[in-house]
């Protein structure tokens, strides 16, 4: 039987060499937009290759995204397996990647409220980047998790007090 691992701080990027990852997986020029450790112990990175094309505003400027799933041996502090999921060129600025069953949740922290309604800053995408659904989770997102049953929990950094990006009326998001 395996001995339990005693809790200690493990500097993630001393285990995962980002420069080596970029070279070996042909991700040169990408930036780490998000990293997250899931319930199953896998580490997920959202890698972004910014586009040279400017959108009508910064929220809609397209970028090419890749989800990276890394299986670690936490006790030995080594990478066991790395899997890439190219998500393609997407016309929104995403800040969070969360596994959601066999799919991914891509989430933008900021979104605007426009004449025709709010930006859809939450996208469920397949592992090959096909957009399965889009919806709005509001502006000013601090963090998020996706529960095993698919429930999305978000926290917000400004509690909606600023009214930025056209959000000048009170909105309540409820399930």
Language-model segments: residues:
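Beta-propeller blade signature
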Residues: 60-74, 118-129, 168-174
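A short beta-strand motif characteristic of beta-propeller blades
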Residues: 19-26, 78-88, 129-136
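Blade-loop segments of beta-propeller domains
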Residues: 52-111
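Recognizes the extracellular SEMA beta-propeller fold with strongest preference
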Residues: 100, 106-127
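Hydrophobic beta-strand positions that form the internal "hydrophobic ladder"
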Residues: 43, 104-105, 152-153
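Repeated scaffold domains used in trafficking and secretory/extracellular systems
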Residues: 26-40, 86-101, 136-149, 175
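Sequence/structural signature of beta-propeller modules
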Residues: 1-74
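Short, conserved, GDST-rich strand-edge loop motifs in beta-rich repeat architectures
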Residues: 47-62, 107-117, 154-173
């Amino acid at each position: 039987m395996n001995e339990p691992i005693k809790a200690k701080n493990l500097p993630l990027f001393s285990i995962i060499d980002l420069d080596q990852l970029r070279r070996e997986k042909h991700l040169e020029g990408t930036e780490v937009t998000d990293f997250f450790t899931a319930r199953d112990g896998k580490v997920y990175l959202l890698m972004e290759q910014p586009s040279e094309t400017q959108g009508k505003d910064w929220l809609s400027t397209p970028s090419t995204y890749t989800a990276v799933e890394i299986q670690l041996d936490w006790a030995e502090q080594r990478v066991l397996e790395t899997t890439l999921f190219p998500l393609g060129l997407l016309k929104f600025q995403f800040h969070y990647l969360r596994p959601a069953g066999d799919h991914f949740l891509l989430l933008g922290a900021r979104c605007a409220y426009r004449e025709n309604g709010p930006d859809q800053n939450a996208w469920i995408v397949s592992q090959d980047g096909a957009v399965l659904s889009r919806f709005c989770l509001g502006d000013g997102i601090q963090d998020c998790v996706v529960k095993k049953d698919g429930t999305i929990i978000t926290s917000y950094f400004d509690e909606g007090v600023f009214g930025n990006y056209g959000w000048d009326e009170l909105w309540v998001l409820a399930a």
